Amino acid sequence: MAVGKIVISVASMLLVVGVAIGVVTFVNKGGGAGGDKTLNSHQKAVESLCASATDKGSCAKTLDPVKSDDPSKLIKAFMLATKDAVTKSTNFTASTEEGMGKNINATSKAVLDYCKRVLMYALEDLETIVEEMGEDLQQSGSKMDQLKQWLTGVFNYQTDCIDDIEESELRKVMGEGIAHSKILSSNAIDIFHALTTAMSQMNVKVDDMKKGNLGETPAPDRDLLEDLDQKGLPKWHSDKDRKLMAQAGRPGAPADEGIGEGGGGGGKIKPTHVVAKDGSGQFKTISEAVKACPEKNPGRCIIYIKAGVYKEQVTIPKKVNNVFMFGDGATQTIITFDRSVGLSPGTTTSLSGTVQVESEGFMAKWIGFQNTAGPLGHQAVAFRVNGDRAVIFNCRFDGYQDTLYVNNGRQFYRNIVVSGTVDFIFGKSATVIQNSLILCRKGSPGQTNHVTADGNEKGKAVKIGIVLHNCRIMADKELEADRLTVKSYLGRPWKPFATTAVIGTEIGDLIQPTGWNEWQGEKFHLTATYVEFNNRGPGANTAARVPWAKMAKSAAEVERFTVANWLTPANWIQEANVPVQLGL
């Protein structure tokens, strides 16, 4: 017999969700020595929402003053409380800087200024979350995944602040000062994760929440492809964006030119801004072109950077969204700088980046990004992305330690080259790198190479982790002769729940037989998630792998790391000349 639609309210559905995750207890109302232990409706609602929170006590305390049992109102109240806590953390940071007065050194001032900036980013995202939620979660519907993504960013911005502080006393002071807002942000993620997970387990999609429908049988694979059109392209990318990425080959290049597949393509795109060192464009520097881009742009700011070496540090502010840069080739258009923690006073890891993308919707093609500080510069980032939905094709990233900082949001890289030594692909984002060349370099004497260092501090409630899919991991020409004596590893855990998957990748013999390494002085490897599947090459032999890494036996075990799942809701581009592989 066919199952009919069951129409319910959001409040009822959340109650059912509470039952599904085992948090609503029906108490016997009968009398007895124990008296009436029945919880009132408000307490039940709070208990239900807070059951999955990392800090249940803090969660309940936050919601106790809210005199309502409406889950929508409770969740919105929780978001407002989180916003208030982040505001206090921002004010605390400013007062800490003021309290240090003239005694503050350049590095402390730089890191506190950065803290203030990223905490403001967190506030802006919380404001967006509250606005998008509306008065009722029914208005959120299919935005639930996006709301959770923004919440992940709010949490990450606060960890960014602490991560950049190297001075121990200041790190302790700031850690304690923003602890409350970080806890509330963490709890908020847990609440959203519990709701979306429980609904998924009950075959309730987020769109059903919007429609008020429970119990419909979903279409096949809807959870993977619900945000793709009939051609397999992401709905969030406009027709103009798709054409831009298809057309943005190196101007005049043959169609087969490139680092790998999907090379040139004619360069028919019409830029809004042109940068040229010889004065033949509107601007001589990239930074000038970025400043000319509008804020909160519903369209695209398209910057064509002509061939040349541009020695400058470029920052794309958070409000300058939807920037698309393309050049004349990854070895022809090069953006380079040499700022580093080791050699540049007043510099932190986050501030060392040659190019720093703070905004959403960034796209790049046919550009080389370099940090030339060298191994003695220690942390020296070539490219850092903080914004959500970054799409990078046919680019090259060269550095030593911390080359590619995939710091926040959802990021997709295809057909790139990235080189480095220590933790040279690292961050706290959901990142997939496909069909790319990864090169370990020769660093300082005795230095060990680590390809990845993921910074997942939150666990499985968030999608934070690095996926290397169908790549090649090799030694560069300077390391080639010493590749068997210089130790190189696939990665090490930067944070307690570090997550990294290497799938369908050719691994050279430079990688140690153990595959993965521990973070010195920490036990993060005991809670980290490291997965390998269907790899090839001499370095892919898993016989001597560390016991805490998982060697997947079937595709089902790594399905969650596909583009369609890891970067949900499938927010990436599939183009004819540079295709996106949604599955394995």
Curated annotation (Swiss-Prot):
GO biological process: cell wall modification; pectin catabolic process
Reported tissue expression: Pollen, and at much lower levels in pistils and petals.
Superkingdom: Eukaryota
Class of the enzyme per the UniProt entry, highest EC level: hydrolase
MF GO annotations: enzyme inhibitor activity; pectinesterase activity
The protein's Enzyme Commission number: 3.1.1.11
Signal peptide: 1-22
Region of interest called Pectinesterase inhibitor, as start-end residue ranges on this chain: 40-191
Reaction(s) catalysed by this chain's protein: [(1->4)-alpha-D-galacturonosyl methyl ester](n) + n H2O = [(1->4)-alpha-D-galacturonosyl](n) + n methanol + n H(+)
Involved pathway(s): Glycan metabolism; pectin degradation; 2-dehydro-3-deoxy-D-gluconate from pectin: step 1/5
Matching SMART domains: PMEI
Transmembrane spans: none
InterPro entries: Invertase/methylesterase_inhib, Pectin_lyas_fold, Pectin_lyase_fold/virulence, Pectinesterase_Asp_AS, Pectinesterase_cat, Pectinesterase_inhib_dom, Pectinesterase_Tyr_AS
Spans annotated as Pectinesterase: 272-571
Keywords linked to the UniProt accession: Aspartyl esterase, Cell wall, Cell wall biogenesis/degradation, Glycoprotein, Hydrolase, Secreted, Signal
General remark: The PMEI region may act as an autoinhibitory domain and prevent untimely PME activity during transport.
Function recorded in the entry: Acts in the modification of cell walls via demethylesterification of cell wall pectin.
Protein name (database record): Probable pectinesterase/pectinesterase inhibitor
Source organism: Brassica napus (Rape)
Taxonomic lineage from the root: Eukaryota, Viridiplantae, Streptophyta, Embryophyta, Tracheophyta
Gene: BP19
